[in-house]
Regions:
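Non-globular targeting/processing and membrane-anchoring segments
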Residues: 1-88, 92-100, 167
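Short catalytic/ligand-binding loop motif for oxyanion handling, primarily in non-cytosolic enzymes
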Residues: 64-68, 104-108, 146-147, 156
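"Short basic amphipathic alpha-helical interaction patches in structured regions
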Residues: 70-74, 110-113, 151
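Extracytoplasmic/secreted envelope proteins and their assembly/folding machinery
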Residues: 81, 85, 123, 154, ...
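Structured segments of extracytoplasmic/periplasmic soluble domains
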Residues: 87-91, 128-129, 160-163
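Thioredoxin-like thiol-disulfide oxidoreductase module
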Residues: 103-132
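A short, hydrophobic beta-strand/beta-hairpin element that forms part of a small beta-sheet core
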Residues: 133-148
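Non-catalytic, surface beta->alpha helical segment in thiol-disulfide oxidoreductase systems
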Residues: 145-166
């Protein structure tokens, strides 16, 4: 069993026997249609997102052996999200949205207002594989984004957000 938390990459199995792919855990690129992303998220979350603010997308892919175990309580998860959002808002003007592919097992994560990834738009844009635990993406209004794939800490979310702020 592999612990991915401190590794810079994942090993992803392919459909070809004995052939795997290495995927970097931090991804960076630029969306050409960033306005379409904001529009889609507004439609599915029923929130108004300020287009001049950055966007943090917290993503839950569904249950796996990493996010269905552990000792976190509902209270500790609430505190975790609250602290993450509080510092994100100090780092940048930012909209934070919580998106899921499969809500099975999500009850223990209920602090946040989770929204289904209808038509798998977010998954196709940022999370092409099921990365263990969950993932996140931070998007600058210019379309420049950074994603953290798989189990993540608040400090990693903050770091990639700070990187984008400094780059712009």
């Amino acid at each position: 069993e592999t612990n991915y938390k401190n590794q810079p990459y994942f090993v992803i199995e392919t459909t070809i026997p004995e052939v795997s792919k290495l995927i970097l855990r931090t991804q960076e690129d630029t969306l050409q249609q960033v306005d379409d992303l904001y529009t889609h998220l507004e439609e599915i979350t029923r929130q108004t997102l300020e287009r001049d603010k950055m966007l943090a997308i917290i993503y839950y892919p569904g249950p796996d052996k990493y996010n269905t175990t552990g000792t976190a309580t509902l209270f500790s998860r609430k505190l975790w999200y609250k602290e993450m959002e509080r510092k994100l808002n100090r780092i940048a003007d930012i909209n934070t949205v919580y998106i899921y592919k499969n809500d099975e097992g999500l009850k223990k994560w209920r602090k946040a207002n989770w929204t289904e990834d209808k038509n798998q738009i977010i998954e196709r844009l940022f999370f092409k594989y099921h990365y263990p635990c969950g993932s996140f993406t931070v998007v600058h209004p210019s379309g420049h984004y950074k994603s953290g794939l798989g189990e993540y800490s608040k400090s990693w979310v903050w770091k990639l957000t700070e990187d984008l702020v400094q780059a712009h």
